[in-house]
Amino acid sequence: MARTKQTARKSTGGKAPRKQLATKAARKSIPTGMGGMKRPRRYRPGTVALREIRKYQKSTELLIRKLPFQRLVREIAQDYKTDLRFQSHAVLALQEGAEAYLVGIFEDTNLCAIHAKRVTIMPKDIQLARRIRGERA
């Protein structure tokens, strides 16, 4: 079938202009100075992330809550021996070590992602970091 050139036709109606919702109309009509709630500041994507990175790099406090970590330690220890008791300093030492390990693995994971020309870490980056470290064959 041969193609034919289409000519412009006059419109016979079409869609009517949509009415604004009451909330949108009210929001536009009320100036911000007349008692309207001021919206919180919206930062550009990545700004808050960089601020958090700087904040956590400066700090030395533990990032995992103490009680949930303690429950996890007790749950894992119960698989090996029941009725084990832990000194509070022992649980803190375990938590320090666990957090240091996690920070290190995430640093290596980030390097693996950057090497792959990405900024987002993925499970395959963690697997590669562990493989290079010799933790998993």
UniProtKB/Swiss-Prot annotation:
Molecular function, one GO term: DNA binding
Source domain of life: Eukaryota
Location of region: Disordered: 1-43
InterPro entries reported for this sequence: Histone-fold (IPR009072), Histone_H2A/H2B/H3 (IPR007125), Histone_H3/CENP-A (IPR000164)
Phosphothreonine sites (modified residues): T12
Family the entry assigns: Belongs to the histone H3 family.
Protein name: Histone H3.3b
